[in-house]
Regions:
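Short, Lys/Arg-enriched N-terminal segment that forms or immediately precedes the first helix
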Residues: 1-13
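Short helix-boundary/capping micro-motifs
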Residues: 28-39
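Central "turn" residue of the DNA-binding helix-turn-helix
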Residues: 42-43
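Key DNA-contact positions within bacterial/archaeal DNA-binding proteins
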Residues: 46-47
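Residues within the DNA-recognition helix of helix-turn-helix
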Residues: 51
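Residue cluster at the C-terminal edge of the helix-turn-helix DNA-binding motif
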Residues: 57-62
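Basic, amphipathic "hinge/linker" alpha-helix immediately C-terminal to the N-terminal HTH DNA-binding motif
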Residues: 66-89
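Alpha-helical linker/hinge and terminal dimerization helices associated
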Residues: 85-107
Length: 112
């Protein structure tokens, strides 16, 4: 047996961040565009953009900055706040997962 859990962060009762949203920001950062990040997740551009805007609205910070293109096209990057949010969430998730595994082992014993 192995423990599984879902983790998300709320502010004033509103969902602001989760594994799904972290994955979206990560894909946007790696692709250099919202459309590329959306494609990697199998989402429409509109849905991905809506998720980013929802997070920004609920947190009150800007997470991505888009630059209009030149010869190579435009680019979207995470803002410093976006990078920090992603890094902190990953650290929080890793700590939570470690605690869940430890507690699971204490309660259920070693996995067979």
């Amino acid at each position: 047996m192995e423990p599984r859990f879902k983790l998300w962060v709320e502010k004033d009762g509103l969902l602001v961040f989760s594994d799904y949203r972290a994955m979206l920001l990560d894909h946007i950062a790696k692709a250099g565009s919202i459309s590329g990040g959306a494609e990697r997740m199998g989402l429409s551009y509109r849905r991905a953009w809506g998720k980013v805007k929802e997070i920004e609205r609920n947190l009150g910070v800007r997470l991505v900055r888009s630059e209009v293109g030149g010869p190579g096209g435009g680019q979207t990057r995470l803002t410093p706040e976006g990078e920090e949010l992603l890094a902190r969430y990953r650290a929080f998730r890793a700590a939570a997962e470690s605690d869940v595994r430890r507690d699971f082992t204490e309660v259920f014993g070693r996995s067979r």
